């Protein structure tokens, strides 16, 4: 434990005397040591061991310089209960250490506040040398001068006194054993009020902080906090750590452990005695005559004191009745923690706050397991996959991780594999016994619900489960709540979840009496057990639920008679490999056929003869995917059936017997291709949902369908032969959803369909319907009407305007030409889609009356203009007129749409915009791309204060008005392919939010000086601008592909990188530098560590983490794409996994680089690519630096948009280099300055036009990235990125003929610059847009 909390003064208004306030104790141990001797070996290991025992230890990790000891160290010594002094060879050479020692011994001898213990450790030194200041200690004192004559006597006295104390002389032997002995001894001597929370307290700090926060230690009120969770999750351990953490703040404390067990075996009296004894500290205890007398004593004594009490493992309210009935029993300022598996106990107790303890995350679980299985904090490499299997099996349960870790310690890989196979069938007894306690406390019905969930319902919707269990008379609502309160299940998004180990416990309970006779079990869930049960001579008589996955059947099952004896069967689920959903529209017809074939192939494994029978009179739920017979069994009795699911079955006609099916709520026969007709529906009056999707042979629906007064959903989607519905459909007074989509022969909606007063959704998309009856207007509850892709639908009914509740009307891709005036009466309409209605020419004049309309999609229509009334659409947010090639003029009153946020005019015939466009105060995105006639952006366009995105790509625009600078919220400005665009206004520098400026393929020649004022600007694209003469240096990204500028790009790169390396630590943390270099000659020799293939591992330099001149690593990989990858312009996604490890610790991170650059497509002779990453040291947690000794880099690559990693991308070679600043340690070849002036020269020009030579800056920075980039031979043009200065340079400014600089600053030895270079922000979401 390393967490601390501030002290709190205790007070009580009801106490007869105010309790004394002890000195503030923040740490258990202050660790004094000589850093250069032991910091990274013995002391570090000792510090970690103390932490694992829950001993709060202060260690000064700073490399301090100076004469006086820091005040925070003196304070830390005073606030520590003890000190551990590591006397090493050079300890006395540090005046700082000696001052610490003097302070420590003063605290040790302080009579006013005794108790500061001192534990000396003599690390490879003779204790007598310390005591007498001889040997290295004598030599140290001999070197001190007269100026220290006042301190030397105190130093000597402190050394002598400390050396006279009992300690540990360490000379030879295993340090791990010695450290264990020391930590155990310190723990025993410090424990006092402290409890042993155990070793290896991984992941506990966050729980402790959460609980302490909930205790509100600063408050003077009484607070009770409940902590609940499944058994073995660590509640008791957390409570002990909190108890130890807060022990210094309370004079009166008690920890009552394992109350449930003690209460059940001994009663409450011993617990009352222990509580009083703890509070009174063994003094003045009185005999308790009865439980009631004990309760009275507790109330009288506690009410006058400020106490801290932990009541551990309470599982029933009766256990609190006579221990702590009410908060009024406690003095003000008291704190109580109650741990339990039963959340209901906490609700009844009315605690102030609740905290649910969740399992460890994967990394924490892996560490905890490794500490027990390998006695280190990560798995051994050979055991990594097996370890991950165990960690996955335990699902973050600390108890299971500890038990299995101990079980597998020092076992071989074959032994591990054997144990894991055993665990699949037989849970470890110690884990099982802990988890089973919660089950043992359940009632009979709750136990049945629990086993049903474990064996059948896990992961299902709560409402569905409740409905089925209620039909079994199990009182599901209260039962599920109790299981949730007792942490046996959890509810997430209304689904019932269960920990895998708890589920396995449920399975074990079912198997308990007859472990090897599955035919006698009450529930079957495993395919192998089902196969064994079918072969049993006496059949399966006791089974209540069967859940069977057909894909896991190893052989064909043909014992049809086995079902005949299942007289208790309540729940039957025979499913395919997946719960296949044929509905998503992205699944094409061929794939749906393939999915159907998968179901039928699996279904064929269960062969049923024509004489198949089973007594179904107890059956509540039946699901059988691919049911193989034409009819249900002749003796089928569905009298208690609630849901019937026969997807993909061979059923031709559904016959459910002669009984009334009053309990039946759901029938799903979807994709039963042979189903041609349904029997009468009169016998199922309470049916609520009927699914007949994909029943391609179904011709009609029986007229009795109108008798189902409670039917809410009727899905007939993709019933290809269905032509119409009976008029009785209008009698479905409760119907809410009617789905007829993709019924390709359905031509006419019934006239009486308007009687369905509850209908809210009507889906007719992709049908043969031509029109709708006027009665459609009577659907007063209809909210959603979809007629999209009805190619024959020509006219929307006049009375359609009566649908007052309609919110969405989808008429996309229909033959509709116009809309009736009554459309204005759709007062609730929010979304109107008319896109791809190629005959639609005119929006109704009175359409502006639709005050609720928020989205209007008119793209790809024949519309020419919009009426002025469009401005009256006060709620409109989205207007799309894209690809309306005849649309020429935006209405003047369009500026009245005050809510409009997105306006798409892409590829229209529009020439200009009215000035009123500036009145669109809410507009966020304006798209005018591909408007080839658009020439002038309106002067008042600068009034759109909310505009973030402006697309002017491929327009005829020549310039922008000065008012563009007033777009203070604009973040993206796209002008690419506007070939006439020549100049940006000077006021563009006022756009303080601009992040991206795309000027590709324009006629622009230069940028205004104000471009340097755009601080947020991160990307500038200037590729293929043949007239461009100036490059700025104020950006994070520049795309200069195919520019004709003869800039010295190497010099530019050096300036960019120098500025970047000079940036703050915070900036290093936020940015990741990477480069993509096509047409490369390979990884240069100065990258020290290289290896063939995609992975490289090397040892780190000694003390790498302490060197202030070491900023990070260069990681590089040489790729060779295949012909396939070079033929297509996919986005290349390069990744590097970085792994630092050593001393049993590991750190992993990932670098990535995505590039749309298509340079590689055009390279004919060589296509090798190099990806380079610059990884800063500051990205590695500083407190862990010293732990790592090796670095490993692993490289991968794929094409973005492809679902697979490309195996044909070869990783030829990779490398790592450790880089330094300010010296010559790397000795890497750097770029040289060009020897010629003129066009090959370079200079800098600042914002005022002053020219600076290339030797202007003489700061000594060693730029390894430039060396790396400059040593690749490249033939392409350039992409430059990451510049931080606000300067620009001209191509025609030359350098002096002779410029001599230090060799570590020389730049430009190669005649051709790099081809692509990019600086990536780790959080940038649209890095690819400008490509």
From Swiss-Prot:
EC main group: hydrolase
Main localisation: nucleus
How changing residue 96 to A affects the protein?
Reduced NAD(+) hydrolase activity
What InterPro entries does the record tag this protein with?
Apaf_helical, C-JID, Disease_R_plants, Leu-rich_rpt_typical-subtyp, LRR_dom_sf, LRR_R13L4/SHOC2-like, NB-ARC, P-loop_NTPase
Q: Where is this region: Disordered?
A: 1-20
Give the positions the UniProt entry annotates as the active site.
Answer: 100
Q: Where is the NB-ARC domain?
A: 206-434
Stretch forming the signal peptide: none
> Superkingdom, according to UniProt?
Eukaryota
Provide the alphabetized UniProt keywords.
Answer: Cytoplasm, Hydrolase, Leucine-rich repeat, NAD, Nucleus, Plant defense, Repeat
The free-text domain note is: The TIR domain mediates NAD(+) hydrolase (NADase) activity. Self-association of TIR domains is required for NADase activity.
Name of the protein: Disease resistance protein RUN1
Source organism of this protein record: Vitis rotundifolia (Muscadine grape)
Taxonomic lineage per UniProt?
Eukaryota, Viridiplantae, Streptophyta, Embryophyta, Tracheophyta
């Amino acid at each position: 434990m390393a967490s601390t909390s501030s002290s709190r003064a205790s007070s009580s208004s009801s106490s007869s005397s105010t309790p004394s306030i002890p000195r503030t104790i923040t740490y258990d141990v202050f660790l004094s040591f000589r850093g250069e001797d032991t910091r990274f070996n013995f002391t570090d290991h000792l510090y970690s061991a103390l932490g694992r025992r829950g001993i709060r230890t202060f260690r000064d990790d700073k490399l301090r310089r100076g004469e006086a000891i820091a005040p925070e160290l003196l304070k830390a010594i005073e606030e520590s209960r003890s000190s551990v002094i590591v006397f090493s060879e050079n300890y006395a050479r540090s005046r700082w250490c000696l001052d610490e020692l003097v302070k420590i011994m003063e605290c040790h001898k302080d009579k006013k506040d005794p108790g500061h213990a001192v534990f000396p450790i003599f690390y490879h030194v003779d204790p007598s040398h310390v005591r007498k200041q001889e040997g290295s200690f004598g030599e140290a004192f001999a070197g001190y001068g007269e100026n220290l004559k006042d301190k030397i006597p105190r130093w000597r006295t402190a050394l002598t006194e400390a050396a006279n104390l009992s300690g540990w002389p360490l000379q030879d032997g295993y340090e791990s054993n010695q450290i264990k002995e020391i930590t155990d001894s310190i723990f025993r001597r410090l424990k006092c009020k402290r409890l042993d929370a155990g070793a290896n307290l991984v992941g506990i700090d966050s729980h402790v902080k959460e609980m302490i926060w909930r205790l509100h230690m600063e408050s003077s009120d009484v607070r009770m906090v409940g902590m609940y969770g499944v058994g073995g999750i660590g509640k008791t351990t957390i409570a002990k750590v909190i108890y130890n953490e807060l022990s210094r703040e309370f004079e009166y404390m008690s920890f009552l452990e394992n109350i449930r067990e003690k209460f059940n075996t001994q009663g409450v009296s011993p617990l009352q005695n222990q509580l009083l004894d703890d509070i009174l500290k063994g003094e003045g205890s009185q005999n308790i005559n009865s439980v009631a007398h004990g309760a009275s004593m507790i109330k009288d004594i506690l009410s006058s004191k400020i106490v801290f009490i932990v009541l551990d493992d309470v599982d029933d309210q009766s256990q609190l009745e006579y221990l702590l009935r009410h908060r009024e029993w406690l003095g003000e300022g008291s704190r109580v923690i109650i741990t339990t598996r039963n959340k209901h106990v906490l609700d009844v107790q009315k605690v102030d706050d609740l905290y649910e303890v969740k399992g460890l995350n994967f990394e924490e679980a892996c560490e905890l397991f490794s500490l027990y299985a390998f006695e280190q904090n990560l798995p051994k490499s050979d055991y990594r996959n097996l370890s991950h299997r165990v960690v996955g099996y335990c699902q973050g349960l600390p108890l299971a991780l500890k038990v299995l870790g101990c079980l597998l310690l020092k076992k071989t890989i074959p032994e591990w594999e054997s144990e894991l196979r055993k665990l699949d069938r037989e849970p470890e007894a110690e884990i099982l016994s802990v988890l089973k306690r919660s089950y043992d406390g359940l009632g009979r019905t709750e136990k049945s619900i629990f086993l049903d969930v474990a064996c059948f319902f896990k992961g299902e919707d709560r409402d569905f489960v409740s409905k089925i269990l209620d039909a079994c008379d199990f009182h599901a609502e209260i039962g599920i709540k109790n299981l949730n309160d007792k942490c046996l299940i959890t509810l997430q998004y209304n689904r019932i979840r269960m920990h895998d180990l708890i589920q396995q416990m449920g399975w074990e309970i079912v198997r308990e009496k007859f472990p090897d006779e599955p035919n006698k079990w009450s529930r079957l869930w495993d395919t192998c057990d089902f196969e064994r049960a079918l072969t049993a001579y006496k059949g399966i008589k006791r089974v209540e639920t069967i859940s069977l996955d057909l894909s896991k059947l190893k052989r064909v099952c043909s014992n049809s008679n086995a079902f005949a004896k299942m007289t208790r069967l309540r729940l039957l689920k025979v499913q395919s490999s997946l719960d296949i959903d044929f509905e998503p529209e992205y699944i094409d017809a061929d794939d749906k056929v393939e999915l159907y074939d998968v179901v039928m192939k699996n279904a064929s494994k269960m062969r049923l003869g024509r004489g198949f029978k089973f007594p179904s009179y107890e059956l509540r739920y039946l699901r059988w995917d691919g049911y193989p017979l034409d009819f249900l069994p002749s003796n089928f009795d569905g009298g208690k059936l609630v849901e019937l699911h026969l997807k993909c079955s061979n059923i031709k006609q559904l016959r459910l017997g002669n009984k009334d099916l009053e309990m039946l709520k759901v029938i799903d026969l979807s994709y039963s291709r042979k189903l041609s007709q349904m029997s009468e529906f009169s016998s199922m009056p309470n049916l609520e949902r009927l699914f007949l999707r994909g029943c391609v042979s179904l011709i009609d629906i029986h007229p009795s369908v109108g008798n189902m007064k409670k039917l809410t959903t009727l899905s007939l989607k993709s019933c290809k032969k269905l032509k119409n519905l009976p008029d009785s459909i209008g009698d479905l007074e409760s119907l809410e959803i009617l789905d007829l989509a993709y019924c390709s022969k359905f031509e006419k909606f019934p006239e009486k369909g308007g009687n369905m007063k509850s209908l809210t959704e009507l889906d007719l998309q992709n049908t043969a319907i031509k029109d709708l009856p006027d009665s459609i207007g009577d659907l007063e509850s209809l909210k959603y009407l979809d007629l999209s892709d009805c190619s024959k639908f020509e006219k929307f009914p006049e009375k359609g305007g009566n649908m007052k509740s309609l919110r969405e009307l989808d008429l996309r891709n229909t033959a509709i030409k116009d809309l009736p005036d009554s459309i204005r009466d759709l007062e609730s309409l929010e979304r109107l889609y008319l896109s791809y209605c190629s005959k639609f020419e005119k929006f109704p004049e009175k359409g502006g009356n639709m005050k609720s309309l928020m989205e209007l999609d008119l793209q790809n229509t024949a519309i020419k203009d919009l009426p002025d009334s469009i401005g009256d659409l006060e709620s409109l947010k989205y207007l799309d007129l894209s690809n309306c090639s005849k649309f020429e003029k935006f209405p003047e009153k369009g500026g009245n749409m005050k809510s409009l946020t997105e306006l798409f005019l892409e590829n229209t015939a529009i020439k200009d915009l009215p000035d009123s466009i500036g009145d669109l105060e809410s507009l966020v995105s304006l798209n005018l791309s591909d408007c080839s006639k658009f020439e002038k952006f309106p002067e008042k366009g600068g009034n759109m204060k909310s505009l973030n995105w402006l697309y002017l790509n491929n327009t005829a625009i020549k310039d922008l008005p000065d008012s563009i600078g007033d777009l203070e919220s604009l973040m993206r400005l796209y002008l690419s392919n506007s070939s006439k665009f020549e100049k940006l206004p000077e006021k563009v520098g006022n756009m303080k939010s601009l992040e991206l400026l795309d000027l590709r393929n324009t006629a622009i020649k230069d940028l205004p000086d104000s471009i340097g004022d755009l601080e947020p600007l991160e990307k500038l694209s200037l590729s293929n601008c043949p007239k461009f003469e100036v490059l700025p240096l104020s950006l994070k990204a520049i795309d200069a592909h195919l520019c004709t500028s003869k800039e010295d790009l190497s010099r530019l790169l050096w300036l960019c990188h120098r500025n970047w390396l000079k940036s703050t630590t915070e900036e290093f943390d936020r940015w990741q530098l990477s480069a993509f270099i096509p047409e490369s000659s390979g990884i240069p020799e100065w990258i020290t560590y290289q290896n063939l293939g995609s992975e490289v591992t090397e040892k780190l330099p000694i003390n790498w983490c302490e060197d202030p001149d070491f900023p990070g690593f260069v990681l590089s990989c040489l790729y060779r794409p295949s012909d396939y990858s070079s033929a297509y312009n996919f986005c290349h996604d390069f990744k590097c996994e970085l792994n630092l490890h050593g001393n049993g610790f590991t750190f992993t991170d990932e670098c990535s680089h995505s590039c749309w650059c298509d340079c590689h497509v055009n390279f004919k002779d060589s296509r090798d690519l190099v990806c380079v990453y610059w990884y800063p040291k500051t990205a590695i947690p500083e407190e862990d630096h010293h732990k790592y000794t090796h670095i490993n880099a692993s490289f991968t690559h794929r094409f973005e948009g492809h679902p697979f990693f490309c195996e044909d991308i070869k990783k030829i070679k990779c490398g790592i280099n450790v880089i330094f600043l300010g010296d010559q340690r790397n000795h890497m070849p750097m770029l040289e300055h060009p020897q010629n002036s003129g066009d090959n020269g370079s200079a800098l020009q600042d914002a005022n036009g002053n020219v600076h030579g290339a030797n202007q800056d003489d700061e000594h920075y060693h730029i390894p990235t430039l060396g790396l980039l400059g040593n690749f031979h490249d033939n392409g043009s350039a992409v430059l990125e990451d510049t931080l200065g606000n300067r620009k340079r001209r191509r025609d400014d030359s350098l002096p003929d002779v410029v001599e600089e230090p060799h570590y600053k020389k730049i430009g030895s190669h005649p051709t610059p790099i081809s692509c270079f990019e600086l990536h922000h780790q959080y940038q979401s649209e890095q690819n847009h400008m490509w």
